Structure formats: C-alpha cells, structure tokens
Amino acid sequence: MPVKKITKEEILLKSSDVFRVKGYHNTSMQDLAEASGLLKGSLYYHFPSKEMLMKDLLISIHKYLTDSIFPIANDESILPEERMEKLLKKMGKLLLEKEGGCLIGNTTLETVGVVPEFQEVLQAIMNDWTAALKTIFETRKNSELSFRLAQQTIMEFEGAVMFSKLYNDRQFLYDAFARTMVKLN
C-alpha cells in the first residue's frame, strides 16, 4: 500500500480534534496517528514527541488567532460594539462548533505546572486575546479598567463555554456575550 502524503498542518488539524475530546494526557501518539491516517512511525517522522506536536499545535492556533480573529479589535471602520460582537462570535464559533471544550482552556488546566513547555505559548494566546479585548474596551473606558474588563470577559467566556458544553445549552454563552456588551457601554 502506498504511503499516504499528509502535511504537518493537516496532522495538526486532525490532532486538535483528538486533543479537544480526549485531553492532552489521555491522548496517545497512536490516537494521533490513527486520526491522521498514518502509521505511528510516520507520525514520529513529523513530530518526535507528543509534546512537540502539541506545542506546534498551540503555536499554530496562536498564529491563526493573531492573523484572523484578534485584528478585528483594531478595525476602526466598524463601531466598537460591532468589533466586540464580531470578535466574540468568531471565538464562540471556534469553541462550540466541535466536540470537546476549549483546547486552550483545557490544555492550560491540564498541563500548567506539569508540561512547562506549553506555558509560554498559552500565556501568549491569553495575553493577545486580552490585548484585543482591551483595545475595544479602551474606546469607552480608561486603560486600567479596560484591562480588567478584558480579563473578566475571557474568564466569563471560558466558563460560559464550559457550562454550554456541560448542559448542552448555548444560552450560557449568549448571556456572557450580552453581559460583555453591557460592560462595553
């Protein structure tokens, strides 16, 4: 049988679904190889360890967010309310459209203090998300308050995703979104 050609990006995409559902520690290289349609040895050719694969996945997610979602905060062609709505809806879609929870939140909870290689990129993601929201809040609030509101929004949003998944009810996320819009004004 011919060897299947697959790119690193495709492996990362398929692996994200496995990590999202099974978590970091409960996912094996065999699970990731099967999800990618590869033999385990072929997966090791691309990624020498599960840690390297996850770190590359987190870096890839960070790049996607900083290239495609966080820049919405700086789009002065639309009102701050529209920026906030657009940014949060895109994040909500990312977090709810697939089985499992928030890969960033889950990986943070599962690996902080255990797999230190991930902490820097996880912090960078949260810092950039905070900065994006702060930019929007600063259109109406002072810098210090905007920073606190941005962090509070992320904490509430992550909790709302968890409740939405647990109770199979997206209203938790809709309510968090509505409260954020009130905080903006």
Spans of model-derived segments:
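Amphipathic alpha-helical segments used for helix-helix packing
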Residues: E82-R83, L96-E117
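C-terminal peripheral helix-coil segments that are non-catalytic and often amphipathic
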Residues: L94, N127, A131-T139, S143, ...
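A general structural signal for well-ordered alpha-helical segments in protein cores
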Residues: M29, M54, M84, G101-G105, ...
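Helix-turn-helix
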Residues: I6, E10, K14-M52, D56
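Short, basic, alpha-helical segments at the C-terminal edge of helix-turn-helix-like DNA-binding modules
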Residues: I59-L65
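Hydrophobic alpha-helical connector segments
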Residues: D56, F70-K98, A150-T153
